[in-house]
Swiss-Prot record:
Broad class of the protein's primary localization: nucleus
Domain LRRCT: 123-161
GO BP terms in the entry: chromatin organization; mitotic cell cycle; mRNA splicing, via spliceosome; spermatogenesis
GO CC aspect terms: catalytic step 2 spliceosome; precatalytic spliceosome; small nuclear ribonucleoprotein complex; U2 snRNP
Coiled-coil stretches: none
Deletion phenotype: Embryonic lethal. RNAi-mediated knockdown in male germ cells, spermatogonia and surrounding somatic cells results in increased spermatogonia proliferation, failure to complete developmental programs of meiosis and differentiation and ultimately leads to complete male sterility. RNAi-mediated knockdown in female germline results in defective oogenesis.
Gene Ontology terms, MF aspect: U2 snRNA binding
Keyword Secreted: no
UniProt similarity note: Belongs to the U2 small nuclear ribonucleoprotein A family.
Full protein name: Probable U2 small nuclear ribonucleoprotein A'
Keywords for the protein's UniProt record, in alphabetical order: Leucine-rich repeat, Nucleus, Repeat, Ribonucleoprotein, RNA-binding
């Protein structure tokens, strides 16, 4: 397995694909988790993470340019909620050959209002009853599902089905499983965080990224610059770093007039 580092990102192949989009090729490294994608500096329309060892789709920094994620042949079984805030313009996600099991596992994708292409072939979920009807109902903007067009008659049939008692019961069951899955994920993450001390934190939003850039300009030592640059590239804010940013905001020019704040980790 290879860790997804800023160095790997910078060394990987970058090119203009046949759709005339700028693409980053991160295929086949057996990467176990998504991290440090902030190092892309939001320069890509497509990121290809196929043929890796991902189990969760999570930890995406703010990448408003990103329109397509290729995630074929991983082991993804969970999609984190709220990713639409990180990649609001995502229009295509290809998840062929993963391990998504239930229709409730797809609920986190509903927030992507520009998602027009989804592929879930060779996932257990694609064989579930009412799969295609559910997707047509939940994703009104979806045009291609598993490389087959969703037609207006498909949407109408889906809407009619989910108005029936059977359809409403199906939606209730999906919602129940989705809530259970989300609660289990939160509990698991909380448990994992107990031994990490201050390494938790959250994903950086655009305002955070701007504050980090300003802090880099004001840094008074190389160590501070390197630390801030690492955080900027990863897109992940450690807990203590949030306190440091608050100190910078409160103190204006910073300690001793230099704008530098001690970085204690």
């Amino acid at each position: 397995m290879v860790k997804l580092t800023p160095e790997l990102i910078n060394q990987s192949m970058q090119y203009i694909n046949p759709c005339r989009e700028r693409e980053l090729d991160l295929r086949g490294y057996k990467i176990p988790q998504i991290e440090n994608l902030g190092a892309t500096l939001d320069q890509f329309d497509t990121i290809d993470l196929s043929d890796n060892d991902l189990r969760k789709l999570d930890n995406l920094p703010h990448l408003p340019r990103l329109k397509c994620l290729l995630l074929n042949n991983n082991r993804i079984l969970r999609i984190s909620e709220g990713l639409e805030e990180a990649v609001p313009n995502l229009g295509s996600i290809i998840l062929t050959g993963n391990n998504l099991q239930e229709l409730s596992d797809l609920e986190p994708l509903v927030g992507f209002t520009k998602l027009e292409t989804i592929c879930l072939l060779i996932n257990p979920v694609s064989t579930k009853p009412n799969y295609r009807e559910y997707m047509a109902y939940k994703f009104p903007q979806l045009r291609l599902l598993d490389f087959r067009k969703i037609k207006q008659k498909d949407r109408q049939a889906a809407q009619e089905f989910f108005r029936t008692k059977q359809g409403k019961d199906v939606l209730k069951e999906i919602s129940r499983k989705s809530k259970m899955s989300a609660a289990a994920a939160i509990a698991a993450e909380a448990g994992n965080g107990k031994g990490r001390g201050s390494e938790g934190g959250r994903l950086a939003n655009p305002q955070d990224m701007q504050r980090i850039r300003e802090a880099i300009k004001r840094a008074s030592s190389l160590a501070e610059v390197e630390r801030l640059s690492q955080i900027l590239q990863s897109g992940q804010l450690p807990d203590k770093f949030q306190h440091e940013m608050e100190a910078v905001a409160q103190n204006g020019a910073g300690h001793n007039g230099s704008g530098a704040v001690a970085m204690e980790y």
